[in-house]
Structure formats: structure tokens, C-alpha cells
């Protein structure tokens, strides 16, 4: 069978780098051919972080960063292809998620905005780009997120197996695969790594809490945990999605103000428990038992995985590597898959997940010619 090569580009709310993957979809399961992470330069990272907060002169900043992020994504593609023997002419298309700078689907006229100019990516790589995947779903009344459950359904579902796929990036989201004719469900549970990353960056100037070691050295404060879990988002019915607009450093500082007597490591432990408890609460609402497979950066946090296992004794816990997909690259592979769906004219959203009025082909194509 002829190879079907696509590239997926993903940079999540953690902004910890641009993941680029080359995937072959010619077989029954996606085959990861090559992978690469392009670091986000500090000046660009600071600009993106500023753009995520309301300020003045946003249009000029947005325009510049849109091009800059497009150039960075193109660099990620070119460096990815330099690692393997696949020529750019063999790649059917790039699926670029872009970098989310606003996600506000619940306004009267909801919107989401990802930057990283696809015209720049196409021009600098010589490969057609498919991008802007989320806004069609929002135009149809949906949340525009999460989009990965459709990929999870095709890749991980098995008849007779009740499975949950948990993606822990900056925000955590779950896909419920019931193993029968029932509807696939999926939604954002709340913070994944975003708050634990923000706190260690603020206190220790470290990018993330490696293996959850700092959290493990602390003791969770139940009063603070209960206050954090009282956020209205956690009691919302699905479909629902969230982002840094709700769970950010400003919100965290506001929540911490009555708890300034706590040790810094105790706060870190409590924030990790916020992630774990909010995930576990939503999973238990779906089913008390089944198989739970984790992907995203959280899959490599041993302390997080231990705490999740303790909260979900009825679940067999593993990473998606047990199903043949490297947890580090799962989301990048999903956006390569979304590019393939667009190229073939096939729908890629699940209305039961996003709340859209119907299925739709997602994304627009930007030619390299």
C-alpha cells in the first residue's frame, strides 16, 4: 500500500515547545516515523504569555507574533524532516494546531483564536498546510474543543473494553470510549499541568516539577484544595472546555491570598491534587471501573500517576504506549490525523463531545504553491 505521510504540529497551553511528528496513515494504525520538539525562544514565549492577557496594542502584537509563530512552526517541520529520509514532496499535508491565545466559546458570540500563520508555514516548508481546526465547530454552536476524542475513538476503541483516554497537557481532557454502541464522550476536566508549572516557575524559576518531586515533598492542605475545587467549572455539565482564561496565575494568586501561611511545597502538592481530584471526580461520574490510558506531559509525572491510581482503584492505569502510541507525541499525531481527515473530506468533530449541531470537515487548506 502506498504511504500516506502527514505532519502534525502542536503547541499546547503549557507553551513548552512545538511538537512536530511525521506519521504514516496507510496502515490500520498510525505509524510514527519521526518526531521533533522545537523549543520556543524566550523572547517569543514572553510575547505569547503577554498576548494571553488583556492589554493595549494587542492587534500589532498579534500580527507580529502570528508571523513569528508561523516561522517557528516551519522551522520545526524543516528540522523534523532533516531527521529522516522522507522528502517534503512525499508529505501530503501538515496539520497545524497553532498556538491558542484565546479560547472563549461560551460568550454570546463565542470564539477561539490560534496563531501561527499557515501561509508562512506553507511558504517556508513547501508543503500544503491545513489549519484553523477549531472555529468551524464553534460556528456550529460547539465548544471547538476537545477535538482529539474523534482520533482516540478511531485509534483506541475496542469492542467490549471500557476505556478512558486522559490527555494531560496544560489543560486535562478525557475521552470516554464505552466499548459498545453508546456515545463517545469527551471534555476538558480542568487544569492539567498549567498551575503546577506556573507555581514552580514563580517560586523556583524551573520550567516544570520533574516527576512531581517538589509536590511529593509537600503536604496537601485540605482547606485550600476544597476552595480550589469549588470553582464553578468543576460542577458544569459537559460538553465543556476551558483554558488559561479561567485557570491562570492571576486566579491562583487570588485563591492563595488567605493561605499565605502555607509552605511553598505544600501549595505545590495541593495544586497537583487539584489536577488529580478534578480528573478523578469526572472519571467516576462516567464509570467506576475500566481501563485508563494517559498521554501528554502528565504521563511522565510519577507522582501524578501515583495519586491518580490511588483515587481510581477500579481502573487499570497505564500510558497510551500500551496501545502503541507514544504518550509524548499523541496530540501531535492527532493533528496529523485531523489533516488527513480534511484532505479526504471527512468529518473530524464529535457533536456529543463538543456540542456542535452536526459533524463537519474541520480546518482550511493553505497551498504551498
UniProtKB/Swiss-Prot annotation:
Gene3D superfamilies to which the protein is assigned, alphabetical: 3.30.420.40
Catalytic activity entry: 1,6-anhydro-N-acetyl-beta-muramate + ATP + H2O = N-acetyl-D-muramate 6-phosphate + ADP + H(+)
GO annotation (BP), single: 1,6-anhydro-N-acetyl-beta-muramic acid catabolic process
Binding of ATP, residues: 12-19
Pfam families according to UniProt: AnmK
Annotated metabolic or biological route of this protein: Amino-sugar metabolism; 1,6-anhydro-N-acetylmuramate degradation; Cell wall biogenesis; peptidoglycan recycling
Family assignment from sequence similarity: Belongs to the anhydro-N-acetylmuramic acid kinase family.
HAMAP family linked to this entry: AnhMurNAc_kinase
Stated name of the protein: Anhydro-N-acetylmuramic acid kinase
Gene behind the chain: anmK
Amino acid at each position: 500500500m502506498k504511504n500516506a505521510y502527514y505532519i502534525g504540529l502542536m503547541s499546547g497551553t503549557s507553551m513548552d515547545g512545538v511538537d512536530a511528528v511525521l506519521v504514516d496513515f496507510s496502515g490500520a494504525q498510525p505509524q510514527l516515523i519521526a518526531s521533533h520538539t522545537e523549543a520556543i525562544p524566550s523572547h517569543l514565549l514572553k510575547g505569547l504569555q503577554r498576548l494571553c492577557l488583556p492589554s493595549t496594542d494587542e492587534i500589532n502584537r498579534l500580527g507580529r507574533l502570528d508571523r513569528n509563530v508561523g516561522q517557528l512552526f516551519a522551522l520545526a517541520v524543516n528540522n523534523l524532516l532533516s531527521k529522516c529520509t522522507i522528502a517534503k514532496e512525499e508529505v501530503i499535508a501538515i496539520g497545524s494546531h497553532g498556538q491558542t491565545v484565546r479560547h472563549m466559546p461560551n460568550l454570546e458570540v463565542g470564539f477561539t483564536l490560534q496563531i501561527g500563520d499557515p501561509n508562512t508555514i506553507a511558504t517556508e516548508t513547501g508543503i500544503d498546510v491545513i489549519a484553523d481546526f477549531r472555529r468551524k465547530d464553534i460556528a456550529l454552536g460547539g465548544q471547538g474543543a476537545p477535538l482529539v476524542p474523534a482520533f482516540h475513538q478511531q485509534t483506541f476503541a475496542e469492542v467490549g473494553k471500557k476505556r478512558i483516554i486522559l490527555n494531560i497537557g496544560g489543560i486535562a481532557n478525557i475521552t470516554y470510549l464505552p466499548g459498545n454502541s453508546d456515545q463517545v464522550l469527551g471534555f476538558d476536566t480542568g487544569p492539567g499541568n498549567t498551575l503546577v508549572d506556573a507555581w514552580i516557575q514563580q517560586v523556583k524559576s524551573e520550567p516544570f516539577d520533574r516527576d512531581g518531586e517538589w509536590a511529593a515533598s509537600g503536604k496537601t492542605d485540605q482547606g485550600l484544595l476544597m476552595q480550589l475545587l469549588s470553582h464553578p467549572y468543576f460542577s458544569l455539565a459537559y460538553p465543556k472546555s476551558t483554558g488559561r482564561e479561567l485557570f491562570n496565575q492571576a486566579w491562583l494568586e487570588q485563591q492563595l491570598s488567605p493561605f499565605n501561611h502555607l509552605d511553598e511545597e505544600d501549595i505545590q502538592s495541593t495544586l497537583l491534587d487539584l489536577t488529580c481530584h478534578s480528573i478523578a471526580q469526572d472519571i467516576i461520574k462516567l464509570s467506576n471501573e475500566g481501563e485508563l490510558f494517559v498521554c501528554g506531559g502528565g504521563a511522565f509525572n510519577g507522582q501524578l500517576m501515583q495519586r491518580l491510581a490511588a483515587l481510581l482503584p477500579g481502573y487499570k492505569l497505564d500510558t497510551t504506549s500500551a496501545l502503541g502510541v507514544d504518550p509524548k507525541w499523541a496530540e501531535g499525531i492527532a493533528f496529523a490525523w485531523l489533516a488527513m481527515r480534511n484532505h479526504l473530506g471527512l468529518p473530524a468533530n464529535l457533536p456529543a463531545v463538543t456540542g456542535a449541531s452536526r459533524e463537519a470537515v474541520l480546518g482550511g487548506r493553505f497551498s504551498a504553491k
